[in-house]
């Protein structure tokens, strides 16, 4: 269930107010059965596993946004948000083999209070260029309860992400440039540790318009990312009796650097792009596995530098009633202390408008993906969507779609560590070959007085 309310008000041409209220509640129930083999140096037995899961998550959000435009067309904006979230999970795993039956239960819930405020100033385009500046603060408090432990285990996690910045943009002839510099304050507080980190935050870009509809772009950014609360929470969230998953309350933020290069060429209705990007994650948070009392424990650690690079090409065609695009790229991943691993990524999109109808389809295929301790092999496309829509009247809309038309989507997850290997093949039956039908009726009144939505992304 979901509810959404957007209020907008413009008392005059220079002031804009808006407020958003949103509520969400999702309940999920899953059951699964697995057949496999348990193999050691002395034993080779078949086993079966039955799993059941009941989860619910959701929350409430409220935000306020204000924007003032000065006489010189510069803009001052401010934003405030409060978010309350909850998540409850009850999972049971029963493993049966030749010798015994092993039940495992996970029962926990989480509560979140999150606050965010920001202020930004934009001078607009002036003879001297464009100046922007601002500051933002987001504070998140999470409470997690592990009901499997006796007594109930209570964990508290607090995270702070705040920054201030200033940027300048201008152009000289066909060359456009932008530079931004700032400082970021990040704080992490758990029941086991408390740390504060001051880090630089920066970005820069160059855009050069060449003759014959050619554009060359280069972008750089430096930012920092906090660990997720789930990576900090130090209790088991796995129902596999032989494989525990738990967080690490001593993690520190990751520093992220990215460089992008793009070359665009337009030829009539076609656009061709060649691109490359390079990413470096210092103090990378990655998974690792250790062994304690013959149990494998997956956790997280800050482990050196991760490097990711890709090169690719993109072509698109845009006519009045037909659009299509296709991209192909090759990616390299390198985790600290490991060899470089590569994979291929293909994306396609088609849309055809005819009369009051339009037909569109998307396609995404990837052969593999990697983490520090595992890789996933995809046996068919990750995404294969087709949809036909009919705008019957201005108010009445109907659509029929097949979210996944390429048979039954499946993949194999392979975890390989010293002394431990796990292969897990997953078939997404509920997502495959399940068409849906949508009919919507929209009420319009005084549409000429409609106010634009200027809220920032939440």
Q: Where are each of the predicted segments found?
A:
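Feature captures outer-membrane beta-barrel proteins of Gram-negative bacteria and organelles
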Residues: 164-170, 200-208, 276-278, 311-317, ...
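Outer-membrane beta-barrel signature, preferentially recognizing the C-terminal barrel domain
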Residues: 212, 224-273, 280, 297-309, ...
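Outer-membrane beta-barrel "beta-signal"
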Residues: 205-207, 426-458
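Membrane-embedded beta-strand positions of outer-membrane beta-barrel proteins
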Residues: 19-21, 78-80, 133-135, 179-181, ...
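Gram-negative outer-membrane beta-barrel transporters
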Residues: 278-285, 295-369
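Face-selective signature of the C-terminal outer-membrane beta-barrel domain
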Residues: 4, 8-26, 53-193, 197-199, ...
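Outer-membrane beta-barrel translocator domains and adjoining extracellular loop/strand segments
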Residues: 1, 30-47, 88-97, 143-152, ...
């Amino acid at each position: 269930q979901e509810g959404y309310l957007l209020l907008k008000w413009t008392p005059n041409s220079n002031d804009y107010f808006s407020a958003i209220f949103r509520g969400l509640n999702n309940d999920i129930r899953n059951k699964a059965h697995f057949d496999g083999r348990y193999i050691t140096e002395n034993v080779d037995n078949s086993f079966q596993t039955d799993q059941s899961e009941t989860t619910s998550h959701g929350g409430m959000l409220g935000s306020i946004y204000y924007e003032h435009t000065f006489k010189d067309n510069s803009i001052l904006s401010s934003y405030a948000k409060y978010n309350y979230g909850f998540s409850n999970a009850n999972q049971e795993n029963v493993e049966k083999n030749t010798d015994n039956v092993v039940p495992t239960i996970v029962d926990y819930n989480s509560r979140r209070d999150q606050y965010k405020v920001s202020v930004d100033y934009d001078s607009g385009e002036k003879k001297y260029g464009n100046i922007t500046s601002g500051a933002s603060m987001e504070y998140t408090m999470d409470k997690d309860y592990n009901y499997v432990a006796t007594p109930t285990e209570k964990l508290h996690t607090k995270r702070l992400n705040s920054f201030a910045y200033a940027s300048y943009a201008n152009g000289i002839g066909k060359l456009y440039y932008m530079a931004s510099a700032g400082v970021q304050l990040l704080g992490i507080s758990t029941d086991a540790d408390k740390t504060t980190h001051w880090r630089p935050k920066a970005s820069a870009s160059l855009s050069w318009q060449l003759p014959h509809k050619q554009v060359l772009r280069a972008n750089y950014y430096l930012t920092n990312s906090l660990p997720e609360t789930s990576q900090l929470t130090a209790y088991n969230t796995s129902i596999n009796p032989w494989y525990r998953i738990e967080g690490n309350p001593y993690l520190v933020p990751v520093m992220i650097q990215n460089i992008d290069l793009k070359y665009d060429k337009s030829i009539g209705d076609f656009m061709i792009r060649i691109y490359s990007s390079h990413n470096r994650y210092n103090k990378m948070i990655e998974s690792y596995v250790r062994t304690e009392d013959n149990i494998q424990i997956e956790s997280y650690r800050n482990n050196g530098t991760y490097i990711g690079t890709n090169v690719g090409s993109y072509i698109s065609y845009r006519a009045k009633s037909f659009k299509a695009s296709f991209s192909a790229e090759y990616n390299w991943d390198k985790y600290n202390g490991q060899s470089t691993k590569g994979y291929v990524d293909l994306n396609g999109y088609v849309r055809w408008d005819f009369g009051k109808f339009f037909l569109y389809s998307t396609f995404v295929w990837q052969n593999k993906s990697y983490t520090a301790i595992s890789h996933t092999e995809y046996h068919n496309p990750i995404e294969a969507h087709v949809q036909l829509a009919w705008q019957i009247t201005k108010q009445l809309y109907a659509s029929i779609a097949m979210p996944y038309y390429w048979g039954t989507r499946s993949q194999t997850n392979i975890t390989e560590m010293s002394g431990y290997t796990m292969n897990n093949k997953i078939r997404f039956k509920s997502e495959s070959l399940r068409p849906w039908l949508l009919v919507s009726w929209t009420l319009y009144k005084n549409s000429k007085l409609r106010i634009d939505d200027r809220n920032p992304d939440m």
